[in-house]
Design a protein with these regions (language model features):
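Acetyl-CoA-dependent GNAT
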Residues: 2, 9-82, 91-102, 151-155, ...
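Short acidic/glycine-enriched loop/turn segments that link adjacent beta-strands
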Residues: 39, 66, 115, 139-143
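Loop/turn elements at beta-strand to alpha-helix junctions within RNA-recognition modules
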Residues: 78, 112-115
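Conserved G/P- and acidic residue-centered "switch" motifs that form tight phosphate/ATP-binding loops
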Residues: 85
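Short glycine/proline-centered loop/turn elements that form peptide/ligand docking sites
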Residues: 91, 115-118, 135-140
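Conserved GNAT acetyl-CoA-binding A-motif
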Residues: 98-110, 121
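Conserved catalytic-core motifs of GNAT/GCN5-like acyltransferases
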Residues: 108-110, 123-147, 173
């Protein structure tokens, strides 16, 4: 049976089966350490009965006033464990913690505009395309992103998910 728990320091040496995948964004060690120290409740792993890491969620809280929200920095599942509902479980954990612990209005995430599989998955989880962010992903292959959102209990009127009527540039993003 799969269990979820907070990410621990030693997991940094155990999650290569998840991280070394072309679909997974990877970060440097200080990035992961920052999340562990600032938002430990939003940095979780799914663990198999044999103690191998099946996937993880890297999240944080940010914003102010009605823009106070949970943010999905990364959610990824090892290829061997995909299509078992683990991403949904990890997302629900982050949503519940964002709502119950951080009292957030919504959860958001950014996804490559070309990643139709992920976009479809997030839409099945109740996320909507809030706005297109032009040139969000820089580098050798620059690409737009979708800022996708899901309203939480605190946003009774669902104001946080009313789609914008125009694309924005990264410098226009506000929290």
């Amino acid at each position: 049976m799969t269990s979820t728990r907070q990410f621990h320091m030693n997991d940094l040496f155990r999650f290569n089966n998840v991280n070394l995948d072309v679909l997974t964004e990877t970060y440097n060690m200080p990035f992961y350490l920052q999340y562990m120290s600032k938002w430990p409740e939003l940095f979780t792993v799914a663990e198999a009965p044999n103690n191998s890491i099946m996937g993880y969620m890297l999240g944080k809280s940010e914003g102010s006033d009605t823009l106070w929200h949970g943010h999905v920095s990364a959610v990824t599942v090892a290829p061997l464990y995909r299509r078992l509902g683990l991403a949904k479980t990890l997302m629900e954990d982050l949503e519940n913690t964002s709502s119950n612990v951080y009292n957030a209005y919504f959860v958001d995430l950014f996804v490559r505009a070309s990643n139709t599989l992920a976009i479809s998955m997030y839409e099945k989880f109740g996320y909507v395309k809030f706005r297109r962010v032009l040139g969000y992903y820089a580098g050798d292959d620059p690409e737009d992103a979708w800022d996708m959102r899901k309203a939480l209990r605190r946003d009774e009127n669902k104001q946080s998910i009313i789609p914008m009527d125009r694309p924005v540039h990264p410098y226009e993003l506000e929290w």
